[in-house]
């Protein structure tokens, strides 16, 4: 069995664009991700949802969403979980892992926007 971990921010959802948008609208807030509702409102990256769905259809693959929480927004745990349910359905929430230390998990592949994750 192949285990694949997929990051959320800037892999499944467009985190950077939302940060830029918030900074443009609210330049006095240095941490846009601290705003309640920020993570829930993220748009999917083009093609990301379809690609994740194709991976889940493979019989020899286990797919998990592995994402770090925001230290600036304690609601990020709930908002990220709700985002996954909205985009992939309730069952996929069982494959959501929210962890600050991604290197602690054992798997075959990590799809992440940060090389050092």
Language-model region placement:
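Structural recognition of alpha->loop->beta junctions
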Residues: 82-97
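Active-site neighborhood of HAD-like aspartate-dependent phosphohydrolases
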Residues: 1-42
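Short catalytic/ligand-binding loop motif for oxyanion handling, primarily in non-cytosolic enzymes
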Residues: 13-16, 63, 72-76, 104-106, ...
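A general structural motif
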Residues: 1-3, 60, 93, 106-107
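Conserved Lys-Pro-Asp/Glu-containing loop-to-beta segment of HAD-superfamily phosphomonoesterases
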Residues: 95-117
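Short, flexible loop segments at the rims of nucleotide/cofactor-binding pockets, characterized by
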Residues: 39-43, 87-90
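Substrate-recognition element of Asp-dependent hydrolases with the DxDx(T/V) motif
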Residues: 42-43, 48-79, 84
């Amino acid at each position: 069995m192949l285990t694949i971990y997929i990051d959320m921010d800037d892999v499944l959802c467009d985190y950077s664009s939302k940060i830029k948008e918030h900074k443009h609208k609210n330049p006095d807030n240095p941490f846009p991700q601290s705003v309640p509702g920020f993570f829930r409102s993220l748009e999917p990256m083009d093609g990301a949802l379809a690609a994740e769905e194709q991976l889940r259809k493979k019989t020899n693959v286990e797919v998990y969403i592995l994402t770090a929480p925001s230290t600036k927004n304690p609601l990020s745990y709930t908002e990220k979980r709700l985002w996954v349910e909205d985009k992939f359905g309730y069952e996929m929430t069982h494959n959501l892992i929210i962890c600050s230390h991604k290197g602690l998990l054992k798997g075959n592949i990590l799809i992440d926007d940060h090389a050092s994750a």
